[in-house]
C-alpha cells in the first residue's frame, strides 16, 4: 500500500491519502483548480506508482495522470463508505445502520444499512453555498479566512427566532429555534458586522442540511446521523449548529475525525484490499 495513493477529486477540493515514511496515514489537500500543484506534489513523491481516484473531477484529473501512473477509478460513494467504515472502526464506533450526510460543495445524503446503501437525497446547499454567499456579502474568498471570523460572529442581529415573533407569549415550539434565516435584515435596522453575516450564512446552511438529514432519519427510523465533509473541518460553529439541532430532534450526531478525507481514504484502501 506504500506505493499507492488515494485521491478524491471533488468539485472544490482535491484530497490525497497515502502512507508516509513512517507508514502512517497522511493527507494532502489542494484546490481542485490547482491541478499543476497536484501534479507537482505527485512528482515529488516518486515512490508512488498507483493511484485510485474518485470524485466528481476524477475523469478530468485522470486524463492528466494516465501516462505516468497506473490508475484505478472508484465510484464516489463506494470510496466514501469504505473510508467512513475505516474511521468508525478506528474511533471504536460499532454502528452499521446510519444516515451519512456528506457536506461538500453541495450535500449528499445516504441511508446505510450493513453493506447496503441507498441515496436518500441531497441539496445544492453546502460548502459552496457558504463560500459563495461569503464572497457576495463580505468579499472573503477563502475558507481559511471565513472560519476565524465566523467564530466571533452572532446570528442574533440577522436571524428571526420563534421567540422574536411570539415576544413574551408562550410559543408552541422552542423560542430559540430559527423562524427566518436573515429575516431581520429585511425588517429592521440591525447592528451587524461581517462576522455576524458569516455566522448567519453558516446557520442557514447548517439548518437546511440538518433538517433534510433528520427527515430521512425519521423516515427510516434511524438514530445515528454521521456528518462528514471538508466543510466541517475546523468549523466548530457549523458543527455546533448541526449537533444542537440533531440532538433537539432526539437523534445522535457523529462527527468523524478526518471525515473530510473519507473518500481519499476509501480510494487508498480499495486498492490495498485488492492486493491483500
From Swiss-Prot:
Enzyme class of the recorded protein, top EC level: transferase
Function summary: Catalyzes the phosphorylation of pantothenate (Pan), the first step in CoA biosynthesis.
Organism name: Bacillus cereus (strain ATCC 10987 / NRS 248)
Key words, A-Z: ATP-binding, Coenzyme A biosynthesis, Cytoplasm, Kinase, Nucleotide-binding, Transferase
Protein name: Type II pantothenate kinase
Record lineage: Bacteria, Bacillati, Bacillota, Bacilli, Bacillales
The keyword Kinase is assigned to this record: yes
GO molecular function, one term: ATP binding
Binding-site list for ATP: 8-15, 105, 127-131, 143, 230
Reactions that this protein is recorded to catalyse: (R)-pantothenate + ATP = (R)-4'-phosphopantothenate + ADP + H(+)
GO CC term (a single one): cytosol
Main location: cytoplasm
EC number: 2.7.1.33
Assembly description: Homodimer.
Subcellular location: Cytoplasm
InterPro entries: ATPase_NBD, Type_II_PanK, Type_II_PanK_bac
Domain of life of the native organism: Bacteria
